[in-house]
């Protein structure tokens, strides 16, 4: 920037987004969302078994951006960072999409969707029926134990009953609602403190947000970890990984930062935030992208290495499935596209400071995150349904679900930017953020 920016250089009341200015992209996302919803409704009623995997893929992919936005607000507040003040409202808007996200996740509560996705739930429901009609008082766990005599694989469900169950106080259903409640509470509380500060400009709201974030970071971490286990690891109840929660978290943080950069670049192209966000902010966000590129690779390799070294049948199946037929090439592509490519592109400081270049890298990052989530969910579909490695034509269902969820959520998110100022204009540290040099 050519000079030191002061509060007098910024518009009173901040900058309010006018949806009409971004009408083309917003309208396109809305249209894609509507078409996707119509197609998804058709597939839901005609091809429920295969479409259930498509919907889970689309929901979880979109969910990662929402929880990623929540993470960046928590980290920004807990670390008492000042540079992120200028872009914090973008994260707040993203995190506060959690209720809309819950609506899209609601179909996962339906038995007809759970049946093809989670085999263990079918066994539990059978055990519940046996327990209900038993001649003498029998618990569901005891019923599962009796069933495991004929099917030895069910011994795993007996062992994991305390976590993988449908009828206790800590059941899958209880946790499902708890995840959204916790994330909603975090997002709503931090947004509330931010808006109160716009009324009086008092630093006490910043201090309060920091104290709140330090307490709730742990609950956030547990929420993301447990949700990742329930929705994805549960696809194969025999499989387990101690690295899974961190693996998913790394992808959430990586992709949500990429989306943040893209949204800011888009807004600046429309004439917003030009005095607030500088090349220095792009450099800082680019460095975080680079850091999480390496961190994700470290966690992904660690998970693979631990499973390869232990060579336990229940664990190795995950990678064996993804090294079969065409999935092997997808696995290799992820190694190159998710790590090697972004790593090399983000090494250079000038590239990280160039909004156009770093935004193009972010487009690639979003695509690779999509491939990564697809690779984690979809390979389970064919074997679980007894169809084979690939399900012919199911990719159309995957695209329909993605358009429905991501398109609609994108439309709602961009429209929601108009509700408040694009940056917290009365935050006492805003000027420090605007003039940041690193």
Sequence positions of predicted segments:
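Central hydrophobic cores of alpha-helical transmembrane segments in multi-pass inner-membrane proteins
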Residues: 3-10, 36-37, 62-81, 183-188
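Long, contiguous internal "core" modules enriched in hydrophobic/ aromatic residues
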Residues: 13, 20-40, 128-334
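Membrane helical hairpin/interfacial module
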Residues: 52, 56, 62-118
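Hydrophobic cores of alpha-helical transmembrane segments in multi-pass inner/ER membrane proteins
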Residues: 66-73, 103-107, 176-188, 250-265, ...
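Central hydrophobic cores of alpha-helical transmembrane segments
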Residues: 105, 356-367
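Aromatic-anchored segments of alpha-helical transmembrane domains
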Residues: 222-226, 363-374
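Membrane-interface transmembrane-helix boundary segments in multi-pass integral membrane proteins
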Residues: 244-248, 314-335, 384-413
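Short, highly charged, low-complexity non-transmembrane loops/tails of multi-pass membrane proteins
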Residues: 422-438
